[in-house]
Amino acid sequence: MNYLRDRFPPDNDQRPFRCEICSRGFHRLEHKKRHGRTHTGEKPHKCTVQGCPKSFSRSDELKRHLRTHTKGVQRRRIKSKGSRKTVVNTATAAPTTFNENTGVSLTGIGQSKVPPILISVAQNCDDVNIRNTGNNNGIVETQAPAILVPVINIPNDPHPIPSSLSTTSITSIASVYPSTSPFQYLKSGFPEDPASTPYVHSSGSSLALGELSSNSSIFSKSRRNLAAMSGPDSLSSSKNQSSASLLSQTSHPSKSFSRPPTDLSPLRRIMPSVNTGDMEISRTVSVSSSSSSLTSVTYDDTAAKDMGMGIFFDRPPVTQKACRSNHKYKVNAVSRGRQHERAQFHISGDDEDSNVHRQESRASNTSPNVSLPPIKSILRQIDNFNSAPSYFSK
């Protein structure tokens, strides 16, 4: 008891309320009663929280204990509020209106704001519904994501020409050598269907005509049948056209294309027959390019002989007379003089090799005698070709 008295305050004897057990004095009675519970062990203040068995002798201790229960609830509430805010936070975003093309429907949002992230999500989704959950927090529900692909309307050309074909050289040749053929009336006899006729940028070019024809060549067999129809005035123009076609072929050796047989529906066959022999020459001529092709093939063999070019064959003289009947043109041969045929320079594909070899073998059987031109004429022609003005220089 002496050690307890050493802890008493110095005015302990002057205080009116003293403890009966330890003689400690207090200024107030409730303080004395509270001190008495320490000796008896009484704990009248029990915790009111369900499931908590604790009790306390002092009321302030009970209040301090109750704060532990309330602080845990408040902490859980604060955590739940923080998680809700991190889901969708629309407090600082700018107001946004969606276009009809994005497929976004806004229901019951009012003055709530949508963040920019939701705009990008909504634009990449097919159907987006935004529901208002209060407190300016929106929930985005996406059903089926879809990707918007821009569609460019490209007009379809029924007969496109590959880009490897140089149209600049075609137009330049057509402008320098216009088509002035006397056989332009042949075009009126055939049906002209723009949907089925192959499209060519310029029909006056011998390069384009040579590429469209399946039996195209620089020098063809049928030129000898049209030499008498061309007339003397077309001799110089035919020379220039043949040299221009030769230059265009040499400057563009690999520019050629082929079309399927269905694209050449308006083509007709011209089948001239020679009475003096069994040889029949057939050549496919396009409707849109018949006049130009006939003009380009009227290179006279007499001029070729004077210039010293070509390989000549000995044949009976014939004279042609064209007659028009059901789109087939026959040639009646009449003996008039000596005529020579030039050598062929034919550029064919794999499917035409058999036909070319068959025709060459048949021609060699009918005329086995072949004479080559002298070397002087060849050298003279090379000099003339080199000295000629170039129309293709830039």
UniProtKB/Swiss-Prot annotation:
Post-translational modification comment from the UniProt entry? Phosphorylated during genotoxic stress. DNA damage induces phosphorylation by SNF1 or the MEC1 pathway and leads to its inactivation, which allows induction of damage response genes.
In what ranges is there compositional bias, type Polar residues? 249-259
Q: Which UniProt keywords apply?
A: Cytoplasm, DNA-binding, Metal-binding, Nucleus, Phosphoprotein, Repeat, Transcription, Transcription regulation, Zinc, Zinc-finger
Subcellular localization(s) per the UniProt record:
Cytoplasm; Nucleus
**Gene Ontology BP annotations:** cellular response to UV; DNA damage response; negative regulation of transcription by RNA polymerase II; regulation of transcription by RNA polymerase II; response to ethanol
> SMART domains from the entry?
ZnF_C2H2 (SM00355)
The name on file for this protein is Transcription corepressor MIG3
Per the UniProt record, the source organism is Saccharomyces cerevisiae (strain ATCC 204508 / S288c) (Baker's yeast)
- Give the taxonomic lineage as stored in the record: Eukaryota, Fungi, Dikarya, Ascomycota, Saccharomycotina
